[in-house]
UniProtKB/Swiss-Prot annotation:
This is Dual-specificity RNA methyltransferase RlmN. Specifically methylates position 2 of adenine 2503 in 23S rRNA and position 2 of adenine 37 in tRNAs. m2A2503 modification seems to play a crucial role in the proofreading step occurring at the peptidyl transferase center and thus would serve to optimize ribosomal fidelity. Its main location: cytoplasm. The active site is at residues 110, 360. GO terms for cellular component: cytoplasm.
Amino acid sequence: MCNNEAKMSELLSVQSDAPAKKINLMDLTRQQMREFFKELGEKPFRADQLVKWIYHFGEDNFDNMTNINKKLREKLKAVAEIKAPEVAVEQRSADGTIKWAMQVGEQQVETVYIPEADRATLCVSSQVGCALACTFCSTAQQGFNRNLTVSEIIGQVWRASKIIGNFGVTGVRPITNVVMMGMGEPLLNVANVVPAMEIMLDDFAYGLSKRRVTLSTSGVVPALDNLSKMIDVALAISLHAPNDELRDEIVPINKKYNIKTLIDSVNRYLTVSNANHGKVTIEYVMLDHVNDGVEHAHQLADVLKNTPCKINLIPWNPFPEAPYAKSSNTRIDRFQKTLMEYDFTVIIRKTRGDDIDAACGQLAGDVIDRTKRTAMKRQFGQNIGVTEVN
């Protein structure tokens, strides 16, 4: 909140004849927007109206906000804007999954919409690239560029909802669940991820249940310990290995926060969270003859024996030059059955969107190349093969 307050103070103190950068209202939670309106000399309830217009109705044009008087609309146009990422590329899978490359400044991030019979999940990115260098993940090959802002995170939800066509029909939600499982490590961008999730939960905005907003982390333990003090959402842990020796190799952050340290933190979170039904989701990617043996299943059962959890087994999704192979169905089934002998709930995740590189672990794909080509196109003004959506 401090950053946004500083931003507002700077904006409102600028002399009238000097150019001022407009504040993006999507960077503000409703409470922060109420402070913004107080700074403008307006009633704080105006923030409630604006939030409804932006997120319930998908409106980004002040002139269309009919219950706000013209004088205030003109004042807002002078100092503020409503700006979400634009879609640079859209791909649709045969199974109904949609992947968008969203333009964020000079870079792109990927957002995935996964419709099912009883729900529709949006997978949202939190960073441009990722610094954690997990060896089985395509995003890791991009490296880390920067954190996304609040507006770039919540703007993915806004843009997807706009495309899917929810706006104007409140109460009917084509997006029922949001998972922070896209590009990046959310707990390395807490300052922007938490406010974005607050907007997702806000009844004046998207009004999602805290059980339908999931944060996935590879295990940034200090941030996880602080998370429950800031917000309560569903938690998923990208574990992927049952022992420190193997996890050090494939999830390098384990060298800093080992499995015991991580699981202890998870258990602390579960004691105060109401969003998890008392259970955490454990994500485990299946790598052929790397982490998918029966002995690994027994080790995993031992690691999780005191942690209420649901285990998702994720068939690995290949990407170019990766040093792994996908586990066979036989090995995955055997792994599942071994864990179920310990009375764990174990689900084999159905692969969605793999024909458009939208499946788990595939995000980034050719987004690196597209980002470079987009920058070159802007620099040289030439058509160099970037497919854009207008």
